[in-house]
Amino acid sequence: MAGSRLETVGSVFSRTRDLMRAGVLKEKPLWYDIYKAFPPLREPVFRRPRLRYGKAKADIQDIFYQEDQIRAKFFATYGSGQKAFDLFNPNFKSTCQRFVEKYTELQNLGETDEEKLFVETGKALLAEGIILRRVREARTVSVRLQASSEGHEPQEDDDLAQRGQVKQEPETAPSPP
């Protein structure tokens, strides 16, 4: 066994005081007089933590910055994008980072409506040559391409074609080899 568990009984000050009284410690520690002159408001003693059953609730409050909310909306609207991060380039800025910077720049110019500001930021980046594709648009395009390669159009395209909004291309049969 590893010895006694006296560290749980009393504070460091009371144990040191008792060791000096018993003659085990010959010299006072440097901190002893200061501690005696300015004792803490609550004496630091060891207390066993209570057992918690179930999931402990965290008292830590989540930290959200405004640009985190902008990033969350950007990723929800545009997705992560097609361009990978270039970690070898120290000056690399992702599309999302450029979007956040442009958003704050336009916000500092006086725009207050978040929806309008979000759309204007997308337009400003488009003017700079950065093309942003919405997540839903990209999915419907990939569904159309996949369906056309299989030889039939999805239901969404049929509905749009009936309304006259989408031009249907005539399907050509593959030529025999």
Swiss-Prot record:
One of its GO terms (molecular function) is structural constituent of ribosome. It is found in: Mitochondrion. The modification N6-succinyllysine is found at residue 83. The modification N-acetylalanine is found at residue 2. It comes from the Eukaryota. The modification N6-acetyllysine is found at residue 102. Its main location: mitochondrion. The keyword Mitochondrion applies. GO terms for cellular component: mitochondrial inner membrane; mitochondrial small ribosomal subunit; mitochondrion; nuclear membrane. Residues 145-177 are annotated as: Disordered. It holds the Pfam family MRP-S23. GO terms for biological process: mitochondrial translation. Keywords: Acetylation, Mitochondrion, Ribonucleoprotein, Ribosomal protein. The keyword Ribosomal protein applies. Belongs to the mitochondrion-specific ribosomal protein mS23 family. Component of the mitochondrial ribosome small subunit (28S) which comprises a 12S rRNA and about 30 distinct proteins. This is Small ribosomal subunit protein mS23. It comes from Mus musculus (Mouse). The gene is Mrps23.
